[in-house]
Regions:
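Amphipathic hydrophobic-ligand
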Residues: 51-65, 139-157, 182-193, 199, ...
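Transmembrane beta-strand segments that form the barrel wall of outer-membrane beta-barrel proteins
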Residues: 174-177, 201-207, 278-286, 355-365, ...
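N-terminal type II signal-anchor transmembrane helix
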Residues: 1-23, 86
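Secondary-structure transition motifs
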Residues: 23-25, 44-169, 174-179, 185-189, ...
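Residues on the solvent-exposed faces and adjacent turns
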Residues: 44, 65-67, 84, 91, ...
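Gram-negative outer-membrane beta-barrel proteins
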Residues: 88-90, 133-135, 178-180, 246-250, ...
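Short extracytoplasmic
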Residues: 21-44
Length: 607
């Protein structure tokens, strides 16, 4: 009887009218045929939105209906299949309703007492070769990166089973979901099985397959309670296992285009548990061609008072992998080039954080040297301790003048804009500079740097076989005037051995210096420099100076210089340039002493 043309026409009219009435819009169906086992096949379906734009088109749809309900003038759909469907959805702005909202509103029961002619309970949905387009028309478009405000999904295929769907339970199985998105996303297959009620939810499995990615999640379970029809978040607990899987980063270039060159896979597995406000990572393992990570950690109070801790059992990075990451991600994530010069990296330690505070403590081993680190970062402040048995500073800085560096240092400081302030204290056991190894240097100072200007206030001590230096004081060029207050004691100082000068070979110097000067430049400097017990020892020479005092000032607006020393005294008053002062004095003396004049002229001629 169902194949009688009059009956088919009646069924078609009932179905079309029921859909139009339920959705409240124009619905077109080109042809309706009956299939096997109560199936109705609809060809050429078009559903319009309320602006009379095509919302959904499908070359063919197959639905399974309840014949008994149909004979009573109702349409009850238990399963559906869509072939070649295209959904064109959009909204004008983020605050306007989408053009499909009326469909959702029509399916929602606003008047429970009113009986609908259409009962849609789709237990099985199959989609083949579908397309989904969505645009938020006021939002800018992007190319090559996923944009949830502009979606263009093609090759959409799905097989979804809704075994149970009631007010208090759900039994859902996605046997397969595959799609492509214009951003470059390719989902080969997603399968999952989920059961849920008002007390617990169980995720039997979730499998995701992409061209080079295979993710396997299992044994997910969550327990919770409802109060006044609302989920009581404090009652939520959950756990989940990510079985051994692998990820090819370039598969996720639709999220971060910089991942496109990363074609080698990374093996990953983890196990987590938690509550509505906490997360515990029982284990996390990552393994790739240039990286290995074994770690665990916790997070809690992430809603308003985030705290986290992590323990890194092993972090290993190969040099070629680091170089590859810097080449492809360096600019986006501001990775310094110095990282690439460390070579292979191995780290073991702990990290924890609270709000903007981050702390790191552990042992770092690299091809450029090893170090023990303890670092705290708080907003724009930092505090840390470093112990190193030897770091190739020249290799890291790419500066041939530097070599190895061995030290124990504490630092406390801040940065704000282009200003850096540091208080440093510690011992530098050795420091290679200009092909010489300095030993036994201690530092206790406060340093502030802004662009090319700097303040220094503190102590510097060096007890090296070729020089003993004790420096205490301050200097600054950050104000309008250069200012320096320094006291220095120097003993057995050998410039040649330190690779600083070769003018006086094998000479050793000693002296005491007390300086207090300020000025815009050398010619306007005011203050004094005192040198005591200056001593020079050389194989064939010995020179000693008890004292030398140089004072610069002004008298009635005129610059004055006063020099007092063992070998004589000098007073200068007037305008002069330090760069030419020595030659000027020599020429004055030469005019009074002819022999000196001849010697000076001969010297200038030789030059």
């Amino acid at each position: 009887m169902l194949h009688i043309p009059a009956v088919k026409t009646c069924i078609g009219n009932v179905t079309s009218d029921a859909l139009a009435e339920k959705l409240g819009t124009k619905v077109e169906i080109q042809e309706i045929n009956l299939g096997f086992l109560n199936r109705i096949i609809l060809d050429g379906i078009t559903i319009y939105d309320q602006q009379q734009q095509k919302l959904l088109t499908s070359s063919r749809a197959s639905i399974k209906v309840n014949i008994l309900s149909l004979l009573q003038g109702k349409v009850s759909i238990s399963s559906a299949q869509l072939f070649g469907a295209t959904a064109n959805t959009y909204r004008q702005t983020a605050h306007s309703k989408p053009n499909y909202q009326f469909v959702l509103d029509s399916l929602a029961s606003k008047e429970p007492q009113k009986e609908s002619r259409l009962d849609v309970t789709i237990g099985s949905l199959i989609i083949r070769n579908g397309t989904l387009i969505y645009h938020q028309k006021d939002a800018p478009k992007t190319i090559g990166q996923l944009n949830l405000k502009h979606l263009h999904i093609t090759n959409l295929s799905a097989h979804i089973l809704v075994n149970t769907l009631t007010n208090d339970s759900l039994n859902l199985q996605i046997k397969r979901l595959a799609l492509d998105e214009a951003s470059g996303m390719h989902l080969n297959a997603l399968t999952t099985k989920l059961q849920a009620n008002k007390k617990e939810a169980r995720l039997s499995y979730l499998n995701i397959d992409m061209p080079g990615t295979c993710i396997r999640i299992k044994d997910g379970i969550a327990h919770y309670q409802f109060e006044n029809k609302q989920l009581a978040l404090p009652t939520l607990t959950y756990n989940l296992t990510l079985s051994p899987s692998y990820i090819r980063p370039c598969d996720f270039a639709f999220l971060l285009p910089a991942l496109r060159p990363f074609v080698k896979k990374i093996d990953v597995s983890t196990g987590i548990s938690g509550t509505s406000s906490s997360l515990r990572v029982h284990h996390l393992h990552l393994s790739g061609s240039s990286i290995y990570l074994s770690a665990n950690g916790t997070m809690r109070n992430w809603q308003n008072n985030l705290q986290w801790k992590g323990h890194i059992n092993t972090l290993s990075l190969r040099a070629n992998g680091i170089q590859f990451m810097v080449d492809n991600l360096g600019q986006q994530f501001h990775i310094p080039l110095e990282i690439t010069r460390l070579g292979n990296i191995y780290f073991k330690g702990d990290l924890d954080g609270h709000h903007e505070n981050i702390a790191l403590k552990g042992n770092l081993h690299t091809d450029a040297g090893n170090a023990k680190l303890a670092v705290n970062l708080q907003s724009n402040r930092f505090k840390g301790h470093i112990e190193t048995t030897g770091i190739a500073l020249g290799r890291i800085t790419n500066n041939a003048q530097f070599g190895n560096f061995k030290a124990q240092l504490d630092a406390d400081g801040y940065w704000q804009g282009n200003t850096l302030g540091v208080k440093a204290k510690g011992v530098i056991d050795l420091f290679d500079y200009n092909q010489y190894t300095y030993h036994n240097i201690s530092l206790n100072a406060a340093i502030e740097k802004k662009n090319r200007q700097m303040n220094f206030d503190g102590k510097f001590d060096m007890n090296d076989p070729n020089g003993e230096i004790h420096l205490n004081g301050s200097f600054s060029n950050m104000g309008k005037l250069f200012n320096a207050k320094l006291q220095a004691n120097v003993a057995h100082f050998n410039p040649q051995s330190l690779q600083l000068s070769k003018q006086i070979p094998t000479a050793f110097f000693g002296m005491q210096i007390d300086a207090n000067i300020k000025g815009h430049n050398l010619n306007t400097a005011l203050g004094s420099i005192r040198v005591k017990d200056f001593d020079m020892q050389a194989p064939n020479k010995h020179y000693h100076l008890n004292a030398l005092t140089l004072q610069a000032g002004t008298e009635e607006g005129v610059h004055t210089i006063r020099l007092d020393s063992d070998f004589g005294q000098m007073r200068l008053k007037g305008n002069y340039d330090y760069a030419t002062l020595s030659n000027s004095i020599t020429n004055i003396i030469a005019t009074k002493l002819p022999t000196s004049r001849a010697a000076t002229l001969q010297e200038n001629k030789n030059k």
